[in-house]
């Protein structure tokens, strides 16, 4: 058993990191990355994810933000169903609930949840970010400097984000 599958062990480890002064814990609430195409999650995955997040939140209380990184492995309907279950734990973000190249579906998820959507590490141009921002598909941008063309291009993207009240 490991921290990706055992919620009690994950909560114990999260509490240890909180005691060390970490202020955020990032994990995939539905387990380790396992799909290469978006998929519809089974009910068991939703139940496991909700239990997992509940136990981790109880372990860290308000000392740590919870960040969900899901690797774009869900369909929009699965992501929305999962988000509705997890909103009660007040996570800071839901990273790439659907594949980031499908901006329409990411925007659908963003409109359906109070959890801020994060994305960007797989995007390469300011034009991709402009489309994402225009559709309000994400409010937290995670640029990879090497992929977007360096500091100058990243600064341009950051300016666009600011104008759209994204970060």
Q: Model segments located where?
A:
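Metal-dependent enolase-superfamily TIM-barrel catalytic cores that perform enediolate-based chemistry
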Residues: 2-112
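Proteins with a high burden of low-complexity, intrinsically disordered sequence enriched in S/T/G/P/A and R
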Residues: 1-3, 166-167
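Shared catalytic-loop signature of beta/alpha-barrel
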Residues: 84, 90-93, 99-167
């Amino acid at each position: 058993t490991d921290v990706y599958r055992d919620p009690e062990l994950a909560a114990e480890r999260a509490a240890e990191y909180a005691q060390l002064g970490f202020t955020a814990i990032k994990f995939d609430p539905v387990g380790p990355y396992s799909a290469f195409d978006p998929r519809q999650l089974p009910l068991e995955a939703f139940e496991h994810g909700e239990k997992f997040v509940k136990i981790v939140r109880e372990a860290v209380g308000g000392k740590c933000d919870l960040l969900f990184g899901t690797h774009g492995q869900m369909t929009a309907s699965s992501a929305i169903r999962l988000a509705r279950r997890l909103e009660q734990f007040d996570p800071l973000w839901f990273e790439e609930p659907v594949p980031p190249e499908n901006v329409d579906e990411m925007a659908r998820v963003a409109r359906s949840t109070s959890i801020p959507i994060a994305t960007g590490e797989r995007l390469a141009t300011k034009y991709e970010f402009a489309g994402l921002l225009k559709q309000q598909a994400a409010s937290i941008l995670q640029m990879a400097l090497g992929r977007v063309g360096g500091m100058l291009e990243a600064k341009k993207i950051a300016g666009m984000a600011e104008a759209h009240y994204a970060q």
